[in-house]
């Protein structure tokens, strides 16, 4: 049975086109995916991401548990409220899921994981947490709104209690703060996002989410759907689980080496496999592609390099760049001239570093010919 967030009727009243997204009835757009994309890049937009999974982890051994569970190191989290992006891996080094974890106390961490992997993730977390005596509590009572764009933070701060606005203004990136709205709603506000823009992701009680959504719209934020969320995250060089990586792909093959922390000698799940892969060299690499010809790069298209064949993972037309962009996984080594098979024609593409766009601007080399 299709699941719905509490904002489902609200989305429909706003004229949203609804689609099935991993078993959830979610808005893909509210009239124009293109307009919503540009609004987030230039002003502000709000996404209902209440389908995501919030998990609270508690216990005296919660930090040792996370040191074992995650490829990135929670030892980097020294100040309460700070957040970390990481993958949790299987023993083969494949990605079970990517997630954000928040350090909220010596015996309390909060994690946000994907919606499509919920049951698998919860089962894995509980299995791994048991020897540490750590409790794993899913929080279906919390909704999540992502308010993103250059104007997003100022608008949200304006809805907070006056006494807490200064602290929210000073909140650093990848950090969270528990505050109240000016009408008394508890808000867990994190300066994180999945768009490449500044903004907040807000966890709040389900019974308050419709009213808070309406307050955001009244303050000038426009609703944005999952279509714009996908083009924004791809421009921002952010992976999508299940499309860009999965349990058969290691972080090294998914351009996520920066999320692997081997230095401090932790015995985390998947470490042995990653060390072996690092020593032998990975067979595949994930690269960014830009197409200067008109057209769209799409998932599954064949990519030819000097080293052999690969394929496009995530591809789209970039509204900000007005060009086709993509992630592709191809054989490791020299790439040479790279082409993509589009309806039987080998179309030349350029290999570029991603992100393609950062805070509304094309990154160096993305627009110019190599």
Curated annotation (Swiss-Prot):
Belongs to the GcvT family. The keyword Transferase applies. It catalyses: N(6)-[(R)-S(8)-aminomethyldihydrolipoyl]-L-lysyl-[protein] + (6S)-5,6,7,8-tetrahydrofolate = N(6)-[(R)-dihydrolipoyl]-L-lysyl-[protein] + (6R)-5,10-methylene-5,6,7,8-tetrahydrofolate + NH4(+). NCBIfam families: gcvT, PRK00389.1. HAMAP family: GcvT. It is an enzyme of class 2 (transferase). The glycine cleavage system catalyzes the degradation of glycine. This is Aminomethyltransferase. It comes from Stenotrophomonas maltophilia (strain K279a). Keywords: Aminotransferase, Transferase. Signal peptide: none annotated. InterPro entries: GCS_T (IPR006223), GCS_T_bac (IPR022903), GCST_C (IPR013977), GCV_T_N (IPR006222), GcvT/YgfZ/DmdA (IPR028896), GcvT/YgfZ_C (IPR029043), TrmE/GcvT_dom1 (IPR027266). The keyword Membrane does not apply. GO terms for cellular component: cytosol; glycine cleavage complex. The lineage of its organism: Bacteria, Pseudomonadati, Pseudomonadota, Gammaproteobacteria, Lysobacterales. The glycine cleavage system is composed of four proteins: P, T, L and H. Its EC number is 2.1.2.10. GO terms for biological process: glycine decarboxylation via glycine cleavage system. One of its GO terms (molecular function) is transaminase activity.
